Amino acid sequence: MTVMLSCLTQQQELLQSLADRVGQPAIQDNLYFCLAGQFTWVEDWYTTAIAGDVLIFDAGEKEQLARVLQQWEQFTGHVILITGLTEEPDPQTFLTQLALGKQQRCGERHFHWIVLVDPTIEEAFRGLQTFLDGKSHWLDLRLGVGDLEQCTDELWQCVWLEPSPLAPEKRQEMLVNLPHWLAEIVDQKQNLELEPISLLQAKLSLLQGLARESRGEMGRKQAQCHYRESLDVWELLGDTEAIIWLSLRLGYLFLLQAYGEKSRGHQLWQQTRNYAQTAIAALENQQWHFTHGETLNLLGEILRGLEDWEQLRQAAENSLIFFYQLSPFAATDTTPERNQEKLWTELELQGLISLAHSYLCEALVEQWKFDEGKEALKRAFETRPKQVEERDYRPCLANLHYLAGRVQLANDQIRESLMTLRQAQTLVSFEDNPRLYLAILVELRECYLQLEDWLAALAIDQEYQAREYRLGQRAFIGPKPLPCWPEQRICRHPLAPEKMLGGGAEARSAVQSKTMVSLTWQDLQKVWEQKPTPVLVLTGEPGVGKTSWLAGEVLQQMSPERVLLVDFTPHWAEKLWVHLGESFSLPSLGQATTPELVSALQALPILDLLLVLDGENGSLPWQKSPSLRQQELAQVLWQWLLTTSPSQGVRLLISVPPTAIADLYEELKGQLGEEHSLPPLQYQTLSPPTLGQAENWLTQAMAQCRHPWPPSLQSQFLGDLAMEGNGEQQPWLHPIDLQLLGTVLEQEQVTKSADYQGKKLDEWLTLAVQTYLAFLPPHLLKKALQLLKSLADGQQALCLKTEYQLLAALYSAPEPAADNPPEFAQEDIQQLQLLLTLLLRGRLIIVISQATLPYYRLSTTHLAHALQGKSAVISTPALINAGRRGSKSNPNLIAPSPGDRQQGNEDLIAELEAGSSAEEQVVAQKLKAAQLQYQKLVAGINLEKQCQFILKQFLVYPLEALLAAVKTGQDLQKLVTPETPLVQYPSLAPWLSLHSILARINECNRCHHEGPVTVLRISPSMENTPPLVLTATTNGIAYLWSFHGELINVLRGHQEAITALDWSADGQYFATASADHTVKLWQRHGEEVATLRGHEDWVRSVHFSPHHQFLVTSGQDNTARIWNFAGEQLTLCQGHADWVRNAEFNCHGQILLTASRDGTARLWDLEGREIGLCQGHTSWVRNAQFSPDGQWIVTCSADGTARLWDLSSQCFAVLKGHQNWVNNALWSPDGQHIITSSSDGTARVWSRHGKCLGTLRGHDHNIHGARFSLDGQKIVTYSTDNTARLWTKEGTLLTILRGHQKEVYDADFSADGRFVFTVSADQTARQWDISQKDTITLTGHSHWVRNAHFNPKGDRLLTVSRDKTARLWTTEGECVAVLADHQGWVREGQFSPDGQWIVTGSADKTAQLWNVLGKKLTVLRGHQDAVLNVRFSPDSQYIVTASKDGTARVWNNTGRELAVLRHYEKNIFAAEFSADGQFIVTASDDNTAGIWEIVGREVGICRGHEGPVYFAQFSADSRYILTASVDNTARIWDFLGRPLLTLAGHQSIVYQARFSPEGNLIATVSADHTARLWDRSGKTVAVLYGHQGLVGTVDWSPDGQMLVTASNDGTARLWDLSGRELLTLEGHGNWVRSAEFSPDGRWVLTSSADGTAKLWPVKTLPQLLSQGGQWLKNYLTHNALVSPADRPGAKVT
């Protein structure tokens, strides 16, 4: 859009009001507008209020009106005629001419205009509105000299004037349109033939340069020409300000051009310096009066680029002198706006002063004047604008932090420097200030190198190279996957801030990225359009560009919110759940059951989401044994992703290496199970680039390179790396070879073929490797090169080696004992793992897993030959598939098996032992030791694989899984000794599997039948007589079992299905009813007594009378009948019009109750007379039962209700709520509650008066029935969803009994309530142990349990609660005392170290002292607010309390106050004694920790945290203090409070930090959901991932080998020192507030906001094996399907 400008500023208000009037109808009519006419600059109201074209002109300009009429045919937009500004012509005459002219030239085409005239004539033209067709055109209006100068001057004022009269966004928008306006102005200037040396010419040249500067390299060169033309004129005219600005601008552009030249004496550098000196001379003449923001920025960038630090220092000092002359004005005038007398607002002036100080600081730092630099930096921070959140000042603040980091680094404050630099990194983005961002990376790299954090240093190196690539500084980025095409890069220099170059939006415009891959987004779309929607599996060799392809081809095609990228690691399921939970309301993983997880996923809306599981950056899920909870979550997510999610708009893309294809298929198959079919897998292989593709890539890369290669060098470079194709396949290159060789050539500035030919290919590649690893110290560099050469030392070009083979090659182990594997030093193992990680991340090597054993090899054949010293090009087609060795999908390419490798080692040993050399004998012994270690490793790997299958198996076959886990545990036991710590086990998987299974298993026995089992009854409890279990099947057979699962008898008397069972009250008889129309009576052990014949159809029920004299039966012949034990029918009850489903006696045996399909229940006497009719149900009555006292009746019906009746057949309550049939209704044993079960998938608990007390939700399908336990406290439900579920009577789910493969027909409790028995259509009856097993729950508190502690002996427990009490417990869970005297909630309590006393602290402002029997001894009064923390001294003689009143107080053990530690004005969160009891450390809300003598004298203050300190602790030797803070860090201090180390890494509040027992490690926990392990140097040893909520507390095991964390995700978790999760302690229903080990390390005690505390066992492998064997004893002894080898007494193999 061309905009003509005018000096008619009086039109501004009119035009603004005009916008308001035109805007609304214009938007509705969708018209097109263009602004032209009397050429005035108007603020951009037309672009926001109107979307189109408008023509505005002054009716007083007659010449202009004539031109408009001549050009009218070219204009098709709105016409706005403005009158009243000058003379007023006759508007009607003009409009008539306008209309006639348009009609003559355009025929019948429509047109439209809006006329604004005086109100007197407005009505006359209101109706003249029609629409125009066609395209709008520009009006070609010729200007005079006066108009041209005025137009140029207005542009000049808007662009040049500082401060600008325009808002920043308006000014930026005007700069974008500047080239279009200038083109027309310059065109008019040429027509008028003005003088070349004039003010107009100077302004136009400057504006033209500014307009072209943002157009890349060519645009900058054009800008240089325009600026020089303008500078020549300004120098003649003598305008100092323009001379300064143009000199700096030219110097800056030459600096950009010169930056690629290494030589500082290059002509471009000299021109840069000349222009800078010109500007400085002009500034000095003007006493720096023209130093404003842009001038100072330009000068600083130029002098920085020239590295002229002395001149930069002088410039900064001169600027400060000038700024401080203005500062009193700025300080007293707080007006935010500018005016003509005021150059800057206060905020802008602060920014300029701070900027000048920062330049001064940088100059001083570069001159190694650190003390002066530190002072300048201090001033820069003091004067910086306080509104740091404003975008304009964030780069300035980032620069200050960068300089502060450099000063700290120079003063050897490495960790402080690291934190400061990280903060600087968060304040600036790479796109906004590339130079500063890269400078920060350089200093960060130096920090990591000094901290010897080589992995972090490598990551910074790689990021730096990638950033330089984006800037066009390099064409190659080291041994990494191929980048996208070069046009994706940001093609500007790091010294070019976006504000200075202008056109930032254009510079950052997203360009479609391209890779050397032919697969496109359209190809993916076609794949996903198939039915059923397939899963896309992306695979290819490491380094071919899968990640680049994902970023370039996939992520750019979809908005970021529609793409979810998750690392495909063992924790992928938890991470995916968290990602989904951030956008949708998903239940917490710590509390939700599996059905709730499934329901939540199925309830998700249409997502339109692409889920990418990227398996390139770590171990894959099946390569590590997850916990059972992770297994369940993964199975839920897989079933959702593969079955349901496609219909919800979710598309799945999985990226894995070729070797993982077969394992991926097995994983998906195993997760879906037999009931679901696996959707099609669409494989897409990204092949290495062909020679032609690489040529295209290199050509484009060189086109933007500062030192491009000639075609001859490009051809030779690609030719040396090319590999011959197979058959018709084209020659190809490995991308890592290309990047590795290209990087070293670029670094060595090789630009000629002759220079390249000076070395062979293998020499170049070896140099490239050495250069890449040059950041390592000499000892590590040497080992890294030895490792690479070891991998190259094999018969094959790409040989595979295990970690232990590399250990044996690089390190020596002490001589092992006989038959024992060698034990390499832990330091050597850690060093090798570090080197492997470094080389893997650098893509110099790759890892291939075979049977979960990792094998390492070099990434490319060229690299292997270079390290071997061979330069021959290998042209074998087998290399294309080198990475697929060991893939089950390609059996022809199998790596040597462990057995083959073992045989090779044995041959080598034998050969060496045959020699006579002592040296050879030593080598042979070492190899033999390595072989033993290798065998042990392989055994551990095999155990890992077995346990992965076992944990999956447990979800379906619990007993078989436990048996298999016991066997793997026995195998592991053979590899270790009783003294071997867990961290040295070759595999922890068997220990983890046993712990996990034994903590969750319920099934303890299984009885197999010959058909579906439909009915179950347990004999009544009898003294000295064990109960028996009676089951029956659909094929007419009944089975009699002992309570331990031993088959006693098989009863084959019925000819058809058995429908009902019952025991007599004395347990001596039982009865079976059948579809064969008969009932049979049997003695206890299965002798048949009588057959009851008389029914004419199926018999549906049978019940004994209470005094076991009679039986009552009911059947489908519409009758009920009473029989004696001789089988004689005594009474016939007739009256029902349909089946009688049930009949039973009341508790006295005098009344009979029947329920029928005719919709009624009836009461009968023993003579068969009907004495009551219960009518009211609208469908058939499925069951009817007397209450235990015989006074009430409950019935349930297919009409969805249950009803309560009295003995007079009056209904007094209708139980409504179910949405389908009510299948069963039963009374609780005490008659106070009723349980109903329904086909709607729920059961409900009701009071005896009909009030619903709770709904039991969770089953997926119809619930057949439900039963109360004998004590009435538990309920079991059984369902067609193949499960039974255990609940409290209040409706809380306790556990799900999984294992049945088909629907569960019946279930019942044992008399003691410890067991549940179930029967199923899967032909089994199962026994489930529902006791709490090893976990002990401490129940009694009525509110949160805030903390729980062991006494020193570990035989007593203390809990404190928000219910204002503390409680003492035994380790069996018995409460022995309630400490109830506080008036507020008890926050903390502790046993004294001698075990004689207890102290509690409360919100009631007191602490109280008790003896260990719970008797209160004294009250510690003195605090003025809540007591937050209490601690005994190590000798039990003193107590320290910490309070919200800002004090800590010291007391003796009689309650006398000894000292007040009064230093703070805010909360003291914690207070701890030193190990010798002589000192105390306190943690406070004022960001400090205090160190005190016990008598109250201050020793030191730990200052440095930037937030409240929540925790403080002495080290075991009392020499150091450890603190944890809200500022996301923990810190270590010396005894006087001087800072030593900062543990920075957490992303949120650090709640607690603890030294390990030996003091060599530190554990921290944080609100960022993680815990971390650190060594004493501050290096992160491990990050503990797994919790789904904040982690609040941590505790070390007494031996320091494990730690336990507690989280608000409802779990506590155990970890080893490598960060591996050992156990998840699940069971609490709310936040776990604390967790600690017992003194012997065998138990963990947790407290929770659910009002309970729990004791969890931590068992050794022998204990677990013993427990597992005991659990399986009955199953292995009596189950007929168990192998004889697994029977007790047989050797388990």
From Swiss-Prot:
Keywords: Repeat, WD repeat
Stretches forming WD repeats: 1008-1042, 1053-1083, 1094-1124, 1135-1165, 1176-1206, 1217-1247, 1258-1288, 1299-1329, 1340-1370, 1381-1411, 1422-1452, 1463-1493, 1504-1534, 1545-1575, 1586-1616, 1627-1657
Highest taxon of source: Bacteria
Descriptive protein name: Uncharacterized WD repeat-containing protein sll0163
